[in-house]
């Protein structure tokens, strides 16, 4: 009869073999080349920015000049590009347009993101079956979208690609888990071939599950995009505690605030930075101590004049914290 230790070792070996088999099943597509028409041109060279430089998340479509100009007018030097509006329309002409606008307004694009194609239901009832790379029905289409995003980002010299990977199972024996490992392995390899990191945005999964995914994919190009509010909005973790688990893997950050969910069907409420549950002084201090080199990109999910007013307030709030950290 096997001892308990032998049984645990056998189970661990079986799980590793299962993960390897699932990963190899799709890894062959990971090195797919970019469209020749897009990648034949010279890549735009992004300037360097200071560690923890403030930035703004923008959705450039349909008017990229207005959005990039706004970044400059609000006093930011970096931006995080949400590019869903351009899926299936990434072209050399678009690269040239974006490169010209970034140069014109002296803005550095730090990270590119897509989450589409639809459907995407941002709640607890339908989110698990619609968001990210976990749901089988949408996985391949989203892998294709992420590869498009990666190739376009490469043409602009952007070194990070990010998305929500979805409600990754807490149970590594769930059949969806190794399939998700394989999918994340595939897109991570594609990004690595483009000289980029692939970042899993925090939110739908616990920090421990995200750490397990990092270890199971086992590729240095895989990292974390920390969204401070999402951890709270989805009820998964306090961002301070999440950094204790994921801190060394964080390569991008959304500065966003929110409150814990009190309705089991709906996410918590996003609020202006400084009015929610995120302890920004502690989070930013921890990132500083970890040697974080990325930007601090404000994300405010309102729109119009109210969004601009909110962002101005949030910028001042974060600048005050960052100045204290730098001058300590």
Task: List where the protein language model places each region.
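Active-site beta-loop-alpha junctions enriched in small/polar residues
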Residues: 57-61, 84-86, 114-117, 166-168, ...
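Active-site acidic/histidine proton-transfer and metal-coordination neighborhood
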Residues: 22-35, 41-46, 62-66, 104, ...
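Histidine-acidic metal/acid-base catalytic patches
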Residues: 2-33, 37-53, 64-72, 207-222, ...
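Hydrophobic faces of well-ordered beta-strands that scaffold small-molecule active sites
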Residues: 52-58, 79-81, 109-114, 161-163, ...
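Short, flexible, mixed-charge acidic loops at enzyme active sites
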Residues: 71, 117-129, 261-265
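Charged helix-capping and loop-helix junction motifs
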Residues: 93-97, 176-184, 236-242, 276-279
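Acidic (Asp/Glu)-rich catalytic clusters
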Residues: 47, 68-75, 90-112, 150-157, ...
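Glycine-rich, proline-tolerant flexible connector loops at the mouths of alpha/beta enzymes
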Residues: 82-103, 165-172
């Amino acid at each position: 009869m096997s001892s308990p230790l032998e049984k645990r070792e056998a189970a661990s070996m079986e799980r590793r073999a299962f993960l390897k088999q699932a990963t190899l099943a799709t890894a062959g597509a990971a090195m797919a080349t970019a469209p020749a028409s897009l990648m034949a041109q010279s890549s735009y060279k992004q300037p360097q920015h200071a560690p923890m430089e403030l930035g703004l998340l923008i959705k450039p479509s349909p008017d990229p000049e207005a959005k990039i100009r706004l970044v400059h007018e609000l006093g930011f030097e970096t931006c995080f590009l949400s590019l869903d509006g351009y899926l299936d329309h990434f072209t050399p002409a678009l690269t040239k347009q974006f490169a010209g606008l970034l140069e014109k307004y002296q803005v550095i694009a730090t990270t590119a993101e897509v989450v589409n194609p639809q459907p995407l239901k941002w709640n607890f009832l339908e989110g698990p079956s619609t968001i990210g790379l976990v749901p089988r029905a949408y996985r391949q289409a989203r892998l294709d979208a992420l590869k498009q995003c990666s190739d376009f980002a490469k043409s602009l010299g952007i070194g990070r690609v990010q998305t929500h990977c979805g409600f990754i199972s807490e149970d590594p024996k769930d059949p969806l888990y190794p399939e998700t490992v394989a999918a994340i392995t595939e897109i991570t390899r594609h990004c690595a071939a483009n000289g980029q990191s692939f970042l899993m945005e925090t939110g739908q999964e616990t920090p421990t599950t995200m750490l397990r995914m990092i270890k199971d994919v086992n590729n240095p190009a895989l990292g974390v995009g920390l969204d401070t509010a999402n951890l709270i909005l989805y009820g998964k973790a306090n961002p301070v505690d999440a950094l204790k688990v994921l801190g060394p893997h964080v390569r991008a950050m959304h500065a966003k605030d929110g409150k814990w969910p009190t309705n089991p069907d709906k996410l918590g409420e996003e609020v202006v930075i400084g009015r929610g549950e995120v302890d920004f002084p502690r989070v930013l201090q921890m990132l500083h101590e970890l040697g974080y080199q990325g930007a601090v990109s404000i994300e405010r999910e309102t729109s119009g004049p109210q969004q601009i007013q909110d962002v101005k307030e949030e910028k001042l709030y974060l600048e005050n914290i960052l100045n204290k950290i730098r001058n300590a």
